[in-house]
Amino acid sequence: MPERLQVYKCEVCGNIVEVLNGGIGELVCCNQDMKLMSENTVDAAKEKHVPVIEKIDGGYKVKVGAVAHPMEEKHYIQWIELLADDKCYTQFLKPGQAPEAVFLIEAAKVVAREYCNIHGHWKAEN
């Protein structure tokens, strides 16, 4: 059963869906159940995927990886998301852009999530 803020992917066409309101049904695309994307938190590949959260004046800066993640046509971060105080903030990225986002919000505790088009869904908490 899908739950709020879970991320699902279609293994056939690549559609990605974030659940806004969980229900009792299954998520289906291209006549197949969509796959729940697990949130990875440990990166064995030299820490290029785990979000790094930095408190800045007036908000938070999220960088993808302790070592900057590639942002090439075939391998890049599609989006960075910040969850805070029951709100969700998303910055969509394109190849060539820096793998980072600034969110000008005040919150004591935040969760950063990002999605790599090849290596999937990653998460970190402050």
UniProtKB/Swiss-Prot annotation:
Residues that hold Fe cation 2 according to the record: 49, 69, 75, 116, 119
Residues engaged in binding Fe cation 1: 10, 13, 29-30
Entry keywords, A to Z: Detoxification, Electron transport, Iron, Metal-binding, Oxidoreductase, Transport
MF terms (GO), sorted A to Z: iron ion binding; superoxide reductase activity
Similarity field: Belongs to the desulfoferrodoxin family.
Phenotype when changing residue 48 to I: Decrease in reaction rate
Reaction equations catalysed: reduced [rubredoxin] + superoxide + 2 H(+) = oxidized [rubredoxin] + H2O2
Source organism (scientific name): Desulfarculus baarsii (strain ATCC 33931 / DSM 2075 / LMG 7858 / VKM B-1802 / 2st14)
InterPro entries: Desulfoferrodoxin_Fe-bd_dom, Desulfoferrodoxin_Fe-bd_dom_sf, Desulfoferrodoxin_N, Desulfoferrodoxin_N_sf, Desulfoferrodoxin_rbo, Desulfoferrodoxin_SOR
GO BP: removal of superoxide radicals
Names of required cofactors: Fe(3+); Cu(2+)
More info: Catalysis occurs at center II. Fe(2+) ion of center II is the electron donor and is converted to the Fe(3+) form during the reaction.
EC id: 1.15.1.2
Main function: Catalyzes the one-electron reduction of superoxide anion radical to hydrogen peroxide at a nonheme ferrous iron center. Plays a fundamental role in case of oxidative stress via its superoxide detoxification activity.
Domain notes for this protein: Is organized in two protein domains. The N-terminal domain has a fold similar to that of desulforedoxin and contains a mononuclear Fe(3+) ion, center I. The second domain contains a different mononuclear iron center, center II, with a Fe(2+) ion.
Subunit composition and interactions: Homodimer.
Name of the protein: Desulfoferrodoxin
Cofactor binding annotation: Binds 1 Fe(3+) ion per subunit. The iron ion 1 is coordinated via 4 cysteine residues. Binds 1 Fe(2+) ion per subunit. The iron ion 2 is coordinated via four histidines and one cysteine residue.
